[in-house]
Amino acid sequence: METYETSIGTQSYPPTLFPPPLGTGGFTTSGYIHALVDSTSNSNSNSNSNSNTNSNTNSNSDTKIPIVQISDDSHITHDSFKPYMEYHDASHLRNRNISKADQVDSTEVMEQFTQWSNYKMRSRSPTINAKPIRHTSQRRTDFTSKNELSKFSKNHNFIFHKGFLKRQHSIRREDRQAKVRSRFRSKKELTSVLNYIELEQMDIANVLASQSVNLHAIRNLTSRDPAVTPIPFLRSQMYATSSRPPYLRNRSIRRKLPKSQPGSLPTTTPATATKTIKQNSTTPTTRSVYNKNVGRSNTSPSVLYHPKRRGKLNTKSHARKEQLLLELWREYLMLVITQRTQLRLTLLCSPGSASNESSVCSSNASDLDMSLLSTPSSLFQMAGETKSNPIIIPDSQDDSILSSDPF
């Protein structure tokens, strides 16, 4: 049997079993368990072990088992725990401020500087919940008799109704606006021209007159519903001449055409293409996607292209894009307000300012604490102003420091 000394006496345990942790075996208290290990406790344990002659005194005196004290106090009064408690309180307060800053809505801070609620209400478009646009049906009376129809059908002729020519004109106009008019009628013509072009001898100024190229139109063509994305600029200096062989150069220029998706712009061959090119071309012809959803009568033109888009307004996509714009604008305004406030506090707490001797500025917090955003009034109290008279830094003036003393 092995003996272990605790604050309540000596307890014995079988050698095959491990003893419970010190200060926890058989105790059910609601207070704190403090293991105070110092020179006094070690000396007391050594004196108690030397007085006991029936047990192994030498082993107990060498191991220096600490004395466990159980206190029911709500706070720690020992001097050795003061640095730990100060660090624990500081970290707990910092974590609480950070969690509050994450949960606090920045609307109160925005209202102190701007009229965000009024702007948000005015920015809502009244046409979001409007009814879908309806096109009135233009019914035309067909005065063709049955005798005329039977006469022309025998000769395999077609009677053009009143709105046929107007509809064909609108189709050609929409087709010209939708597709990009190229100089080449097919891919073979483009490939044949590229085979005779030396990119190393070509002057880039003849192709790109400006210093930058706007890719906004290309992004709108590639995406069906373009979101709020920044417009990149492609510098003309990035087009460097390559020193690769011609066969590799021609292969790198070729690009695969994207697959046609329903709702996207169709890739139709122009009507001026010759018959020889159509016979020799090996690329499969893409069918037009407009014939699937177009529903019109035989005598009246209806919505020709994209009937779903023209017939009604997509309220969900419009609201989503508008919400994204509002969030981006709100984030930008919040960053500007925070930076201006931090700049003002830095100027007030600078060595050359008169408010440097205040208790708030004398602290070690150099950066703007996120907990200040939860209480907007504290921003003005730190700056020495009131809520009715906030600090305003106009954009026309310079934000530079007029003081001669450096930071």
Curated annotation (Swiss-Prot):
Residues 40-61, 266-276 have a biased composition (Low complexity). GO terms for cellular component: cell cortex; cellular bud neck. Its main location: other. Residues 306-315 have a biased composition (Basic residues). The modification Phosphoserine is found at S260, S264, S300, S302. Induction: Expression is regulated by the ACE2 and SWI5 transcription factors. Residues 40-64, 251-315 are annotated as: Disordered. A motif (SUMO-binding) lies at residues 391-398. Keywords: Cytoplasm, Phosphoprotein. It is found in: Bud neck; Cytoplasm, Cell cortex. Interacts with CBF2, GIS1, NAP1, PRM8, REI1, SHS1 and SMT3. May be involved in a mitotic signaling network. Binds sumoylated proteins and may stabilize SUMO chains. This is Protein NIS1. It comes from Saccharomyces cerevisiae (strain YJM789) (Baker's yeast).
